[in-house]
């Protein structure tokens, strides 16, 4: 091949490549599957990945009250949050999220549309685990303020795939509203039988976990939250220990982790309560919720119905923890859970009360 022919071939190949890349970028920009530029106006949005789409939801939806959490908050409606606390509400979910991931969401939220109030779910399982376990699942380039990252969004095989997926889903009328996006309340059975069936009861541990075993990781996670309170003094933070079911307490008791978990919860109270713009709520200790297994589909996740009860209790302050009452609250709750009759859930009488016909 002559030099001239080679140059023509190279230029043709380069032009073809640029045209293909341009076409891909145009498709991604037009569909905008992650709502990076806008929320769709002419079609219902398609929700498929919380980590990819939360950044766009934050960028393009201002709200007075924002609920942020893991999958524990997935079945709350933003409209309910707004109705309870006043103003507009928005729910943001990062399933099995790490605190570094929540921090990315919070930073973007405060940079774009800072709300008056943030509700944040403190999941005991996530609060006490090592931050070092975080994966690379979070697309950081969608959350930063570097405009050069537009290219990473537009010229990305994942977002191109998501664009095609969104187009096909819209053809199948699979779009949802922002209020219901990522909700799965109607996909499972909320019932005591389901909760118990999904609960894998551990064997009793031969040795208990040391009381201080979870403190270092808990302190590192709490530092993320206290940094929010310091950086955003004009924002009210309503933090709450997520209401895992009573089966959670059976699990940590059998695993020998009771002392370690209570030490971590005490550290959380000591750390968070001194901040004037933080209010802390002990929903994890609320018997109205956690003992009602019909609210659950496993040992931790609760229904939208229970979520509405959580919002009402947050608003009323029914389970509020203070520097004056948290020690007594934790002591009383520890006494309650270590002496609880967990075996009743596997007793025939427990099942008969639900499944024996009333012949009276």
Label every PLM stretch briefly.
Residues 193-275:
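Conserved, well-ordered alpha-helix/loop/beta-strand core segments that scaffold catalytic motifs
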Residues 46-73:
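Short extracytoplasmic
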Residues 48-53, 98-105, 222:
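N-terminal post-signal-peptidase region of extra-cytosolic proteins
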Residues 30-51:
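Alpha-helical transmembrane signal-anchor/signal-peptide segments
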Residues 62, 68, 72-152:
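Membrane-embedded segments
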